[in-house]
From Swiss-Prot:
<feature type="binding site">
    <location>
        <position position="145"/>
    </location>
    <ligand>
        <name>Zn(2+)</name>
    </ligand>
</feature>
<feature type="transmembrane region" description="Helical">
    <location>
        <begin position="195"/>
        <end position="215"/>
    </location>
</feature>
<feature type="transmembrane region" description="Helical">
    <location>
        <begin position="4"/>
        <end position="24"/>
    </location>
</feature>
<keyword id="KW-0472">Membrane</keyword>
<keyword id="KW-0997">Cell inner membrane</keyword>
<dbReference type="GO" id="GO:0008270">
    <property type="term" value="F:zinc ion binding"/>
</dbReference>
<dbReference type="InterPro" id="IPR001915">
    <property type="entry name" value="Peptidase_M48"/>
</dbReference>
<feature type="transmembrane region" description="Helical">
    <location>
        <begin position="39"/>
        <end position="59"/>
    </location>
</feature>
<keyword id="KW-0482">Metalloprotease</keyword>
<feature type="active site">
    <location>
        <position position="146"/>
    </location>
</feature>
<comment type="similarity">
    <text>Belongs to the peptidase M48B family.</text>
</comment>
<dbReference type="GO" id="GO:0004222">
    <property type="term" value="F:metalloendopeptidase activity"/>
</dbReference>
<feature type="transmembrane region" description="Helical">
    <location>
        <begin position="156"/>
        <end position="176"/>
    </location>
</feature>
<dbReference type="GO" id="GO:0006508">
    <property type="term" value="P:proteolysis"/>
</dbReference>
<keyword id="KW-0645">Protease</keyword>
<keyword id="KW-1133">Transmembrane helix</keyword>
<keyword id="KW-0378">Hydrolase</keyword>
Amino acid sequence: MKRIVLFLATNLAIVLVLSLTMRLLGVEPYLTANGLNLTSLLIFAAVMGFGGSLISLAISKWMAKKSMGVQVIETPANSTEFWLVETVRKYADDAGIGMPEVGIFPSPEVNAFATGMNKNNALVAVSAGLLSTMTRAEAEAVIGHEVAHVANGDMVTLALIQGVVNTFVMFLSRIIGHTVDRVVFKNEEGHGPAFFVTMIVAELVLGILASIIVMWFSRQREFRADRGGASLAGKGAMIAALERLRSLHPHPLPDKMAAFGIAGGGAAGLKRLFMTHPPLEERIAALRAVQ
């Protein structure tokens, strides 16, 4: 609840600053006089921006199960499944969250993810490849990392951040489109083709810039989840798991699941700005530096 209030307050503060700036610069009266109601536009952008993000969050477990082919363990069928469920249960208790659903998805790659609407209604899933490749201690560290994602509320946090950036991308792109339509193309009635073309281009450009912000937050949450995994499973085990991942070069999860997996693909140069995960070398170094 505190997280939601914080981000709504942040969103409101940005809106107020933006509105005041536009008023001081004479932009708001000009836009209003030329047929653009900023209050209505902002409400529309917020409803659409947050609506899409929160709906995605609400159906995230269902989507993950369908897209990844996750088999939820209702009753453990063997010793491995029993160990997996009990490990998640122990870490969930230690982290003070409700017991997540536990599942396995059929992939030879070494990976895992967590998703869900809130801390007490989550899903933690690991790949078959992880279970067959990693040692128990390494796998437990990966599970601890995913439980830490849930305990830290990372799914909700990133959904709210995405909602904020969605709102401002939609809001600013329509202002830009309206201004170009009125000032450059001298369209006095309604909105012509210039508005829609400019709006789409502005949404694309602003959306790319906004994704850099979201990805930066995602990378910071990974460092925190690593520390959480180290706290639950042991620092040595967490470092060993990351080193194993580095040696295996794991295939990344699909885009919608990547932010909550254990590993991300490597990238250099500008591509680093769009990474959901920090490089494994940086994550290992950060953990080694923790006292």
